[in-house]
Each structure stands twice: as C-alpha cells, then as structure tokens.
Amino acid sequence: MLTIKNWQLLSENDKKLCLSRPRQSSAIKENVLEIINQVQLSGDKALYDLTKQFDRVNLQYLQVPQEKIEQANIPKNALNAITQAIGTISSYHQSLLPENTEISTASGITIRNVYRPIQKVGLYVPGGNKTPLVSSLLMQAIPAKVAGCPIKVLCTPPDAEGEINEHILVAARLCGIDTIYAIGGAQAIAAMAYGTESVIKVDKIFGPGNSYVTQAKTLVAIDADGAAIDMPAGPSEVMILADTEANPEFIAADLLAQAEHGPDSQVILICDECELANQVNQQLEIQMSYLSRIEFIKRSLANSRIIICSNQSEQLDIINSYAPEHLIINRKNPEPWVEKIVAAGTVFLGSWAAETMGDYVTGSNHVLPTSGFARNHSGLSTLDFMTRFTVQAINQEAIRNLGPAAMTLAELEGLDAHANAVQIRLNTLGD
C-alpha cells in the first residue's frame, strides 16, 4: 500500500524526494529522434514500418476510409453518454470564446484584438490499453470545433486488425472530424508535424500520450519546420488534500481512479493524521481486489505516497510546489483554499467532486499540464485553438503627438531607420 511519510520529520532533501515524479529513461529522447528522422526521410513507408514494429500490425491503409467513419455504429447507451458529454463540454468551451475588443491608447490611436481559429490542427488520442479513449477525443475535438478550426485531423493507434474502434469513429463523426489516421506513438506526432504523402502537415498538435508521445511533441515544437504543441502532457497524477472528516472510501476510490491510468501515474494524499492514512490504505486493499487493472495500479502506487502534515501553511506549500495535474480538496470547507492555490491543472472541491466526473462529463477540459508544468501552463481550452493578432490604426494627430517620443526611443537604441520612418511623416505634415 501507500508509504506514509511524516512531513515534519523529513529533511529538506527527503521532502524533495517525497514530491519527485517517476523518472523517464534518458534513452527515450534518442529513440524518438530516430523515429522522427525515419518519418521525415521515408514518409508513409516509415509509418507502415513503424506501425508493424511497435504495434505489430500490417496496416492496409493509413487514412481510415470515409465509408468506415460514416457506417460506424455503437450501442445506444454509449451513444447517449457521448452525446451528453458533448453537450456539457460544448457549453463550457463556448463560454471561453473571446470577443474582439478595441481600445484607444492615445488620441489618434486605436488597437483591436482580433481572434482567428488555427487553420490546421492535429489531434492525438492514445491507444488506451486496447480501450477507446473517447473522452480524450472529445476534449480536443470539441474546442477545435467551437474555435472554428477548418481542418482537423485525428491520429490514433490501430487495433490488432489495423482498425480504429467504432466508438472513436462515431465520436469523431459527431464532432465533425472526417480525416482520421490509424497511426499512434511518436511516429503519429512526427507525421502531423512534418507531413507525409498521406498525412496532412498541421500547424499545432494536441493531446496526451505516453513518454514517447510527450517527447516527440517536445522535439517537434522546438523545430522551426515542425509544429506548435498544446503542452507537455505526460503521465497522469492526482493530489488529494483531506481533513479528518473526509470519507476514506471516497479518497481511496479517487486515488485508484488515477493510478489505473498506467504504471507511471502518481497519486499523493496529504492528510492531518495517521488514523485517516491507515483507513485509506485499508480501503485501497479492499477496492483493488475487484478492479481489473491491478498490475498498473500496484506499479503506480509504488511511485506514490501519503504525507502526514497538520500545518495548513505547509500543506499549501506542498501543493504549490508539486503543482498537481489534478487537485482534490476533500475538506469540509474547501472554497477558501482556492485563492491560495497558485499551481494546479484543475481543482475539485468537496467530497462529492470525484475526479472521474471532470474526466468525462462536467464540461471542463481534462487535457491538463502534468509533471509540474501547471506552474506555467493551463489546461486545454478554446483559446488554445485560436491565434490573436492586433490591428493598429494611427492617424496624423498621433504622429504629431507621439512621433517625437517614438523617434527619441529609436535613437536611444541606435535605430536611425526607425526614427527616419517617423521623421519623414512629420516632414510631410510640415511639423
């Protein structure tokens, strides 16, 4: 079960180790670079070869035929659930649409903010250990649709027969995506970043994935010929802050829900006393016994821990230092804590706020910064699928009033051509 650590008894170095994430292999970067190079050099052929190598599938095609998307069919209960999720996710992301604004900064000057959808976006949906990660698709496709992105392509790994799960096809169809590639892993990221004979080169790539996918996204983002990315979204994680009144059964369930994502997921509980910690560990044993992904969970829990800390100021320091992807404040009065949180992907308030609800149906986006990136990144939103540019209108009055100041600043920086561009206009005005 989870190791219990008393925060007050730890050295500064031990505290850092207590909040450290599982380390990724240094060999991953080299392997991913090789995959990217293969795709750049050999295009479609590399995609077929790499899919055979990693997925052990001989693909019949890279792009899913249109008729397969149109004919895909799923059980009614699944269709209803997807439709309900689309409703809440759409409502939330519609609320994030920005308005074009205009301001006058000085007499004769107006500046407008203009927002436009990114023209070509690539969405990546992981394989999900042979299960269809429909929610990952919805969390990307819906804000892309709301933003108005005209070209939306989807890459997701094929199954053993080289096909895409029909739940994914139906969800994509409902979200207006008709360009789907049966490609996964780092090779999918490379294909969308650079393009191949069959795969469209996109402007920005979205979506979570394993360490290979995350590394590939990072590498293509720093290449001028590659593509922008949403964020480095790696292994999933949750941190729970609980008081003595919290239900240990609920806490254990939330920890396990995150741990089942994969062996490199991490879960951390912060609580006031050992009694609750022991009760949670007992519940973990009970609930694990009937869950299907027990091997994933066991390996994840080995990377995880319970921290005993009764000082609220120190509890906040732990949270903000760790910057969790998901933070659950399972306390009697959680709201006052929010204003003191400075780094978290998303925050769930109260005992009924199961993180599972946020994963699927609240409407908030579940593509969130991990590995501490919540310190400087936000969760995915409609704005991530848009660009903003300014429109500046400057008339003669502004040239007269502010031109001399612009010239002075240009000359201070040794840029006489800049100053000249204003001086010529002042000369024309006769000033």
Curated annotation (Swiss-Prot):
Q: Which PROSITE patterns does this chain map to?
A: HISOL_DEHYDROGENASE (PS00611)
**Cofactors:** Zn(2+)
Which GO cellular component does the record give, naming just one? Answer: cytosol
Enzyme Commission code:
1.1.1.23
Q: Which SUPFAM superfamilies match?
A: ALDH-like (SSF53720)
The source's superkingdom equals Bacteria
- Entry keyword set: Amino-acid biosynthesis, Histidine biosynthesis, Metal-binding, NAD, Oxidoreductase, Zinc
| Bound cofactor: record note | Binds 1 zinc ion per subunit.
The first-level EC class reads: oxidoreductase
Q: Which family does it belong to?
A: Belongs to the histidinol dehydrogenase family.
HAMAP family from the entry? HisD (MF_01024)
Name of the protein described by the UniProt record? Histidinol dehydrogenase
Organism of origin is Legionella pneumophila subsp. pneumophila (strain Philadelphia 1 / ATCC 33152 / DSM 7513)
Q: What is the lineage of its organism?
A: Bacteria, Pseudomonadati, Pseudomonadota, Gammaproteobacteria, Legionellales
Q: Which gene encodes it?
A: hisD
